[in-house]
């Protein structure tokens, strides 16, 4: 039984899908105006791991992750670069796909782009206006927050707390709003900006409405899981809930999941703070699989401090698992003991996808394998578990010359010619091949 920590209820809840053996997930993707930073990469890795574990447990997963390609940041970045907004978005969508592929993230079932859903967005906003949940003002359209029941429940706040937080903050939209808490569904076009015709004049959608429209258009009025970074709880996901449920009269998502921040020197990594490392740059000096495994060692909801030491530790641990995976088979495998490892792993991961505890079990299993319990069945299951964390090892094939040297050393040992055997061992070590003599025969690993 899989349990999920639901941000909305602040509780661990048993996962019950809307449709049997199927998971419909929507995860907020990047605003494509720059390379993603490592914090964005963690979100992609976290939800890919969750997706993979659902699949490991036998579910079919419809995994939708959008590209926000209509946004103020894109307009500004495109103008600065002397590019069209579409050309800029296309560039960074391609970069995103390349970066997350290097992190072992599977392609989404679908990556919707805002630009392809403009009429759906306009229709959605019109319904909210018709139902009295939204109003037009000077070409903008705003959502009436006070008409929404339990508006800020996801953020665990009251309207009074939001009002206090908003006091003293006056923006260019304030004079157009009925209430300072109201948020934009549609923005009137400014001169020179990309725009679409609508019943309220030329303009473009607000950020929050975009995800509501894409999620419900593709997956239906109610989805199983909606995910994203913890920074999206308010206002983005809060506003998504308000506008979606106002339109449909139904619950928008049954489970809300949020991954923790990545910190640099114990401070949240973000583009606004200027303390970020892009995945694009990180991959120039470290292996994507190492970076991914680094994040898997911490529970997805917890903040993570990005340090060089932690990366080095992840690299060492991955090397150990690789050497374990490449071991030759042994004669003895206790199926009952192996089954208990699998049960223990599942119990760890069923508890809100606790990768930290799950990986602890993986290393216990590796230790058992290295003590002489390995056959094809164990190897196949070991590989299946590792791929949940994006770890896929290619089969190492020794070239004929090295195979011949190992065989010659075995013959020398059998003839008790230990001088020759040691010389061959040293020759192999110089080529990066480490030999281990065990009761089950010789084993080798890349050093």
Swiss-Prot record:
Q: Which UniProt keywords apply?
A: Aminoacyl-tRNA synthetase, ATP-binding, Cytoplasm, Ligase, Metal-binding, Nucleotide-binding, Protein biosynthesis, Zinc
Cofactor (UniProt): Zn(2+)
Citing just one GO molecular function, the answer is:
cysteine-tRNA ligase activity
Motif: 'HIGH' region; annotated at 30-40
State the free-text cofactor note: Binds 1 zinc ion per subunit.
Q: Which residues bind Zn(2+)?
A: 28, 211, 236, 240
Specify the domain of life of the species encoding this protein: Bacteria
Q: In which broad location class does this protein mainly occur, judging by the first location in its UniProt entry?
A: cytoplasm
InterPro entries the UniProt entry points to? Cys-tRNA-ligase (IPR015803), Cys-tRNA-synt_Ia_DALR (IPR015273), Cys-tRNA/MSH_ligase (IPR024909), CysS_C (IPR056411), Rossmann-like_a/b/a_fold (IPR014729), tRNA-synt_1_cat_dom (IPR032678), tRNAsynth_Ia_anticodon-bd (IPR009080)
The short motif 'KMSKS' region is annotated over 268-272
Q: Give the catalysed reaction(s), semicolon-separated.
A: tRNA(Cys) + L-cysteine + ATP = L-cysteinyl-tRNA(Cys) + AMP + diphosphate
> Binding of ATP: at which residues?
271
Where does this polypeptide localize? Cytoplasm
User: Which EC number(s) does UniProt give?
Assistant: 6.1.1.16
Q: Which SMART domains match?
A: DALR_2
Set out the biological process GO terms recorded for this chain's protein. Answer: cysteinyl-tRNA aminoacylation
Quote the Gene3D superfamilies the UniProt record gives: Anticodon-binding domain of a subclass of class I aminoacyl-tRNA synthetases, HUPs
One cellular component term from this protein's GO annotations in UniProt: cytosol
Keyword field contains Cell membrane: no
Q: Does the keyword Electron transport apply?
A: no
The UniProt family comment states:
Belongs to the class-I aminoacyl-tRNA synthetase family.
Q: How does it assemble?
A: Monomer.
The name of this protein is: Cysteine--tRNA ligase
